[in-house]
Amino acid sequence: MRNYDLSPLLRQWIGFDKLASTMQGGQEPQGFPPYNIEKTDDNHYRISLALAGFKQSELDIEVEGPRLTVRGKPTPVEKQVEYLHQGLVRKEFSLTFTLAEHLNVDNAQFENGLLHIDLLRQVPEALQPQRIAIGSATPQERQVLESPEAPDQQ
């Protein structure tokens, strides 16, 4: 398995691997909520956000153009609690990811405190690379092609 070193500036740009590998430096990434960006192959990506304590109804995913935005707004706690130690954070957040061209949200699941967003690259057939078969002419075909009396040249 490969690890891709994305600079902090481009951590939220998904599908721009060549661009990301050429850029250096950047800004501090957002600390909450923690998330992973996984690349399983050239056409499949997954964003996983750790959202312990959130309910599915408190989360919203929106795609507008190339921007994927994930928002969370926890419901207020009815009874105030005095924490001796607070390690779990439940605060409002908004994360925006910039998706590469032809990268679309395929699926989203919230399970065991993790929000998984699956992305799929779907390049139209007309834009995909084409393989051209290279053939070799038989000796008889070569004579026809090299002949000055070929039917095309009259």
Swiss-Prot record:
Gene: ibpB
Translocase listed as a keyword: no
Domain sHSP, first and last residues per copy: 26-137
Subunit architecture: Homodimer. Forms homomultimers of about 100-150 subunits at optimal growth temperatures. Conformation changes to oligomers at high temperatures or high ionic concentrations. The decrease in size of the multimers is accompanied by an increase in chaperone activity.
Domain of life of the native organism: Bacteria
Location in the cell: Cytoplasm
Predominant cellular place of this UniProt entry's protein: cytoplasm
Organism: Yersinia pestis
UniProt protein name: Small heat shock protein IbpB
